[in-house]
UniProtKB/Swiss-Prot annotation:
UniProt xrefs under InterPro entries: GPCR_Rhodpsn, GPCR_Rhodpsn_7TM
Protein's job: G-protein coupled receptor which binds to the neurotransmitter dopamine with high affinity leading to the activation of an associated G-protein and downstream signaling pathways. Couples to G-proteins to inhibit adenylate cyclase (AC) activity and cAMP production. Antagonizes the D1-like dopamine receptor dop-1 to negatively regulate the rate of locomotion. Negatively regulates locomotion through the activation of goa-1 subunit proteins which inactivates the unc-77/nca-1 and nca-2 ion-channels in the command interneurons.
Disulfide bonds: 95-173
Protein name: Dopamine receptor 3
Family listed: Belongs to the G-protein coupled receptor 1 family.
Listed PROSITE patterns: G_PROTEIN_RECEP_F1_1 (PS00237), G_PROTEIN_RECEP_F1_2 (PS50262)
Length: 607
């Protein structure tokens, strides 16, 4: 590519000539040797290591092949030309081959870097599409074919006689056609160079935006952790409240049994016989045998659910005393309800500070639309309960429910999992509607807040199950309720996004794209360094080469650039072919391991 080699007389000092010959004779052969050795390592590493066989690395192999050909077919002629005192003695054919190889391989290096830049742009800008369609060997082969086809097309005119050698001066082999030099420099270097700079600018801007989005997601994650803590805290308080009500109710029932001199016996239900028999035996140890009296049941408590049946046997003369005990029991339960309802409302008020918009999406955080409304509902229910009177109790056999061991687990699980809500003032009662109405069933009703439970939140969509259906289903569990609310939460959040109606990629594809994106980020940094080094090495030569061609077009007998600057810039460009393998070794761990395995004949890999 030297376009001014006839200016060899620029070096006039004999001392400078000697120093130049010594330096050129020692150091110039090292450049093609390093280029051949390093690029062969790159090619072998990609074909030996399966983990390196990616689209990007296939393009890197194409770049290594072009650098290898520069070292073999261009630098070797350059060393010979310099050692022969810049006199070409191989004839016009080899001169044209030398020039064509120089132009073709240099153009291929530039276009390979452009293809790599396009590959980086697709991988960073559209990671899911790249993981689906871009990471295929066929696309890499198409890119490589286009690169080498254009490079050969650019260099082909040199073989067709565009730059003929003068018959009277066969000792010089130079690119003397200024028009070809200018056009080839613009289309082979400057246009691809500008395109690569634009692409890498967009790539790094995308990476910066992605980093900012990652920081925002981390901030939102901390806020979500607070919300999760509030949810867990509210669920824990609800479980503690239910457990306390259950234990306290059982304790009060036992106290009533002792106060009325009654003792529990087995009911008609055979399922509970094995459960309550130890309790009966314990009472029989303390109480003497008596003649059975007509019995009646204790009215159901509105603040707790029904439980497996136990029968309370009592004397007729204890009816009045029993009614007084029942009133004390109701007052005690109301006091406990007041205490723990205030506590749970305070906890819900704290959790609301993290986002009141979750009321509709997650109704299990707070059952009402506001804390104030919950308190109003609490006072209204309490006043309604206080005005309820006991029905006339007749001395006949009735039952009251106490949880069995088997049902207690189901009751605890369902009561912890099901949401309680109140919306638009509509109430749906799932417990005993009246203290005088008697229940003889298994424990399917639950402890609840303020005696009411709303199922409207589960009936918003026609395809959802109602709360009654869920209660009737014995297999209803915590995972069922969480699945309902996760689906509702996802739909509510997806409507807020712009592309909620687009088909979502599979989870496997997202994980693959995420992993691919991390790897592409590292590869992008490495290839950005390769591009920077390439520009540093080749930009001086092409600037001087274009300037010299413009000067020759203006005046055929004068050149703007001297021989020595152009000669040094040419070898600086050749040096780039030796630096690329060093860049891969420094910045890419996989290439470094592959180089070490090749140089050690696989010893490190076997270990």
């Amino acid at each position: 590519m030297l376009a001014g080699q006839h200016h060899v007389t620029d070096i006039e000092s004999p001392l400078m000539v000697v120093l130049w010959r010594v330096a050129a004779g020692v150091f110039l052969p090292l450049v093609p040797t390093m280029a051949v050795f390093g690029n062969v390592l790159v090619i072998m590493s990609v074909f030996r290591e399966r983990s390196l066989q990616t689209v990007t690395n296939m393009l890197i192999v194409s770049l290594a092949v072009s650098d290898f050909m520069v070292a073999i077919g261009v630098m070797s002629f350059g060393v010979y030309y310099e050692w022969n005192d810049f006199k070409w003695g191989l004839g016009s054919f080899f001169c044209h081959v030398y020039q064509a190889l120089d132009v073709a391989c240099s153009t291929a290096s530039i276009l390979n870097l452009l293809a790599i830049s396009l590959d980086r742009y697709i991988a960073i800008g559209h990671p899911i599409s790249y993981a689906q369609y871009g990471a295929r060997g066929g696309r890499a082969m198409i890119s490589i074919t286009i690169v080498w086809g254009v490079s050969v097309a650019v260099a082909l005119p040199l073989l067709l006689g565009v730059n003929p050698m003068e018959e009277n001066d066969l000792q010089e082999c130079e690119l003397a056609n200024p028009y070809f030099n200018m056009i080839s420099s613009i289309f082979s270097f400057f246009i691809p160079c500008i395109a690569m700079i634009i692409l890498y600018t967009i790539i790094f801007r995308r990476l910066r935006q992605r980093e900012r989005a990652r920081s925002l997601r981390q901030a939102q994650r901390s806020e979500n952790d607070k919300i999760s803590s509030a949810l867990l805290g509210g669920a824990q308080i609800a479980r503690q409240m239910g457990k306390h009500f259950k234990n306290r109710t059982d304790q009060i029932l036992l106290e009533i049994s002792f106060q009325t001199s009654s003792f529990p016996t087995m009911s008609e239900s055979s399922e509970d016989a094995s459960t309550i028999s130890p309790m009966i035996n314990s009472f029989n140890n303390f109480l003497p045998k008596k003649t059975p009296y007509p019995s009646t049941s204790i009215p159901a408590i509105p603040e707790c659910g029904s439980m497996p049946n136990l029968t309370i046997i009592e004397r007729p003369e204890a009816e009045k005393e029993k009614e007084i005990s029942i009133m004390d029991l109701r007052d005690t339960v109301e006091m406990l309800d007041d205490k723990y309802s205030s506590a749970i409302l305070t906890s819900f008020q704290t959790s609301r500070s993290f986002g009141e918009e979750l009321e509709e999406i997650l109704p299990f955080i707070d059952g009402s639309n506001s804390v104030k409304h919950s308190r109003e509902q609490l006072h209204t229910t309490r006043s309604n309960t206080s005005t309820t009177r006991l029905l006339d109790v007749k001395p006949e056999l009735r039952s009251i429910s106490v949880p069995s061991i088997q049902d207690e687990k189901k009751l605890s699980q369902k009561s912890n999992d099901l949401p309680f809500s109140h919306q638009n003032g509509t109430h749906k009662q799932k417990l005993l509607p009246n203290p005088g109405i008697l229940m003889k069933s298994k424990s399917t009703t639950l402890l609840k807040t303020n005696g009411y439970m709303d199922t409207d939140s589960l009936n918003r969509n026609s395809h959802k199950k109602s709360l009654a259906d869920l209660l009737a289903n014995d297999e209803f569990s915590f995972s069922d309720s969480m699945r309902v609310y996760k689906n509702r939460l996802f739909k509510s959040l997806s409507r807020a996004t712009s592309g909620w109606n687009k088909p979502r990629p599979s989870r496997h594809m997202v994980k693959k794209a995420t992993k691919q994106m991390r790897r592409e980020h590292k590869a992008t940094v490495t290839l950005a360094v390769v591009l920077a080094v390439f520009l540093f090495c080749w930009l001086p030569f092409f600037v001087l080469h274009l300037s010299n061609s413009i000067c020759l077009i203006i005046d055929e007998n004068s050149a703007c650039v001297g021989f020595l600057p152009l000669y040094l810039a040419t070898w600086l460009g050749y040096l780039n072919s030796s630096l690329n393998p060093l860049i891969y070794t420094v910045f890419d761990q996989r290439f470094r391991n592959a180089f070490r395995n090749i140089l050690s004949c696989g010893i490190f890999k076997k270990r």
